[in-house]
């Protein structure tokens, strides 16, 4: 029986989970809640056996999880992809935290009612953060070495989202551009992105000042 992944019908926090599942070839069913489905979700939220009800949720047989990082860690652990030593596991946790910091920083700008005002400062400071990631990646193909892990999809998704706000943000960082292209070229990811199941837009919830709406900026 396939696992179930529930989230809003947008990219948001579920997109790295989707990408990771697709990369692994895991069979799963998506339960998507549209813009007008808030009442539907609220009617189901506390009746699904979730310990801490929220979106995204992931139900795999008896395992019922919420929180996107916890979901990805569970899936990674099932596939033996969480490291083999305390040092490796701690390093992966560190990357998760930094990737979430990047995502949260992007989200704060996108959901700010004064978006146009805060955007300028965000774009101005962005190169410092991107340089940190570029330096960390170095000559490796992926964040933990030569193999793909869930943290790669966490970073990829935020980088891809940021480019809608700052289209040329990666021009100074060829290693990050190559990393992004490398993820998109993975056969199963490429096939997913070309499928009807792939959600390109919106990036954020419908209350966002940026990344919502019916179509991406031209």
From Swiss-Prot:
Q: Domain of life of the organism in this record? A: Eukaryota
Task: Please list the residue ranges annotated as the GST C-terminal domain.
Answer: 85-203
GO biological process terms on file: glutathione metabolic process
List the EC numbers from the record: 2.5.1.18
Name the UniProt key words of this record, in alphabetical order.
Cytoplasm, Transferase
Q: Which InterPro entries match?
A: Glutathione-S-Trfase_C-like, Glutathione-S-Trfase_C_sf, Glutathione_S-Trfase, Glutathione_S-Trfase_N, GST_C, GST_superfamily, Thioredoxin-like_sf
The function of this protein is: Conjugation of reduced glutathione to a wide number of exogenous and endogenous hydrophobic electrophiles.
What is the protein name for this chain? Glutathione S-transferase class-mu 26 kDa isozyme 47
């Amino acid at each position: 029986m396939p696992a179930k992944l529930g989230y809003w019908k947008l990219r948001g926090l579920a997109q790295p989970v989707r990408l990771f599942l697709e990369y692994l070839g895991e069979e799963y069913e998506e339960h998507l809640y549209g813009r007008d489905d808030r009442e539907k979700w609220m009617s189901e939220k506390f009746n699904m056996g979730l310990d801490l009800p929220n979106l995204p949720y992931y139900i795999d047989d008896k395992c019922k999880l919420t929180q996107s990082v916890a979901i990805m860690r569970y899936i990674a652990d099932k596939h033996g992809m969480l490291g083999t030593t305390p040092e490796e596991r701690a390093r992966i946790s560190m990357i998760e935290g930094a990737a979430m910091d990047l995502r949260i920083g992007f989200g704060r700008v996108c959901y700010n009612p004064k978006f146009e005002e805060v955007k300028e400062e965000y774009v101005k400071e962005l190169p410092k953060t991107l340089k940190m990631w570029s330096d960390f990646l170095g000559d490796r193909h992926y964040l933990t070495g030569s193999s793909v892990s869930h943290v790669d999809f966490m970073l990829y998704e935020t980088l891809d989202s940021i480019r809608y706000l700052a289209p040329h943000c990666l021009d100074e960082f060829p290693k990050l551009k190559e990393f992004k292209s490398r993820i998109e070229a993975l056969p199963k990811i490429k096939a997913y992105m070309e499928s009807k199941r792939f959600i390109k837009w919106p990036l954020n919830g419908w209350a966002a000042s940026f990344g919502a709406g019916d179509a991406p900026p031209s």
